[in-house]
Curated annotation (Swiss-Prot):
It comes from Tremblaya princeps. It comes from the Bacteria. GO terms for biological process: chaperone cofactor-dependent protein refolding. It is found in: Cytoplasm. InterPro entries: Chaperonin_GroES (IPR020818), Chaperonin_GroES_sf (IPR037124), GroES-like_sf (IPR011032). One of its GO terms (molecular function) is metal ion binding. CDD domains: cpn10 (cd00320). The lineage of its organism: Bacteria, Pseudomonadati, Pseudomonadota, Betaproteobacteria, Candidatus Tremblaya. The gene is groES. One of its GO terms (cellular component) is cytoplasm. This is Co-chaperonin GroES. Keywords: Chaperone, Cytoplasm. SMART domains: Cpn10.
Amino acid sequence: MSKIRPLGDRVVVKRSEDETKTPCGIVIPDSAAEKQDQGTVVALGPGKKDSEGARVPMEVRLGDRVLFGKYAGQSIKVDDEDLMVMREEDIVAVIE
């Protein structure tokens, strides 16, 4: 993967692979499959600045599995990998 360095409080997330089969074996075509709203954090910005100019540390860490809103962020493609760039506030939870 190319090196991508997000700015401010932005996070780069690699979307989780979509399931193409249901547990009972039914194959779901790409046209009917909904994109999963979860992924793994692969890059972090340095954090946003507060009103006094000090950096606010990021709450998520590299490698965290996260949930995000359906319309969160921007989809990008880097080296044939589908990634999302979003603000940290668009992440709703860390999956532990």
